[in-house]
Structure formats: structure tokens, C-alpha cells
Amino acid sequence: MKYAIEVNNLNKTYDGFTLKDASFKLETGTIMGIVGENGAGKSTILKGILNLINIDSGEVKIFGKDFKENEMEIKKDIAVVFDESYFHDNLKIPDIDKIMQNIYPNWNKNQFLKYTNKFKLPKDKRVKDFSRGMKMKLSIAVALSHEAKLLILDEATSGLDPVVRDEILDIFLDYIQNEDCSILIASHITSDLEKIADYITFINDGQIIFSENKDELIYNAGIVKCSEKEIDKIKNEDIVGIRKNTFGCEVMVNNREHYENMGFVVDKTNLEEIILFTVRGAK
């Protein structure tokens, strides 16, 4: 099996925050979503992968090669979109096109202009006059225009209206129709990840809680409706989290069919509820 990214035991300590032994693998030709609350460590992982911060320990391989040792070679095949624009305020779209031609040997001007037109970005305006959403669309247009094999995206769809967001998600899905291309996307918008991701990596307080196939994760999870006394019938290792209310209890389990077969009422669930129960559903 080929991997676009392999992260092994990544550690980084800041004042008041520690990323602890982060490990996961992104299979080539797939999309992985990294989800977690603000401050959970999503951006730290991405910056650690890209060698934008000095990690304390750990190893990152991209396309099977040690990233630190082969950074310049590998970077030509990576596109990165962070949640803030990195273009100078005075640049216009034609200026950016010329700059990128000198940076990327595989720069595709026609592709770039296709996306800037699709996103309705004005060619005569300077970046400083763009809205936040327009700046994000510009960054995405650049990322998709130099034949990168790996997209690394940090909150790339935040600040966009739902229609444009949906359009961009479809573009990402089209991008990975090329089986050599992969996407790692960090986002707090779980509905976006539920639509496009093949795998979900959930990080909380600097620690990866799980990294799993998204469809299997959602299919296997369910919410058992029961009384407080009936909780004793549910195996502790099957419990993701518990919510109590005036009508009884809601218990998220990771083995839905088993409890349906036991006669419990079990509701299907979604990624957002899985995250909420994992973080806030006290066992």
C-alpha cells in the first residue's frame, strides 16, 4: 500500500500545550479529514508535517521519503492552503500568475485562469481589496494549478458561503479521481468532512483519539435510548459517551448492530455527534 503521508510519534510542546505522539497514515488517492476543537492541535500537526515548526521528536514521510531530508524535492508536488492568505496585498491576479510561473515548473496558467473565473475573482483588484472568502478562493485556485500530488488544507472552506463551499468540495472530489493525488484537510466543519473524507483523524487536547475509515466509523456508531438502569447492560468498552436528560439516557456505542439485536432502540448518527459524544459525553 502506498502512502502520501506517514506521521510517526510527532511531539511538540508549547507553553500550555503539548502535541503527544501523533501518528497516522494517509493512503495515496484518498482524503483524510483532521477534526478537533479550536486549539486541539490540528494546525500544529500540519505545521509539523511541513517542517514549519521545529518538532521535539517524531518522523514525517511524504511520498515515502523523509520530508526533512528531501524537502525541496517534495515541496514541488505539494500545495498548501492555510486559513490566512499569504499573498502580498498589492498583487493582482495577473501578477500572481507571473510569480507562480517562476516558482512551479508545472504551473498551468489556463487552469489557474479557469478557477479564478469560476470563483468570479476580479483580475483588476488588488488582494488587499478581496474579502476573506475571495482570498481563500484565490489560494485554492493557486493550489489546484501546478499539478500537485498532495493538497494540505487548513480550514480552507471556512469563511465561504454554503454554495461556494459545496462547489469547492466537489472540486476536491474531482481532484482525487487521479489515483496519485491525495488530500489532508483540517476543518471544524464536520459536514464538509462527512461529505468528502475517506478517513477521519480526531484530535483532542493534543492527542489523537482515533484515525479511522469514515464510513465504517459512522456505520458502526449508534445512539442507544435507554433508562439509567439499562446502561449496565452495555459493555463499557462499547461506550463512546453518555448523555443524561429528563427522559432517560442516550448512550453512543461503537457497535450499533449488536445492541439493535439485543432489542434496544438505536438511532443512527453522524460525524458531528460522534465528536460531541467523544469529547463531552461523560462515561
Task: Locate each region found by the language model.
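Conserved ABC transporter NBD signature motif
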Residues: G58-E69, E73-I74
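ABC-family P-loop ATPase nucleotide-binding domains
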Residues: F82-L138
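Helix-to-loop junction immediately C-terminal to a conserved catalytic motif
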Residues: L50
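Catalytic Walker B motif of ABC-type/P-loop ATPase nucleotide-binding domains
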Residues: L151-E155
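The feature captures the beta-strand-to-loop junction immediately N-terminal to the Walker
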Residues: V35-E37
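Conserved structural motif at the start of ABC-family nucleotide-binding domains
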Residues: I5, L19-D21, K75
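ABC transporter nucleotide-binding domain
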Residues: L169-V253
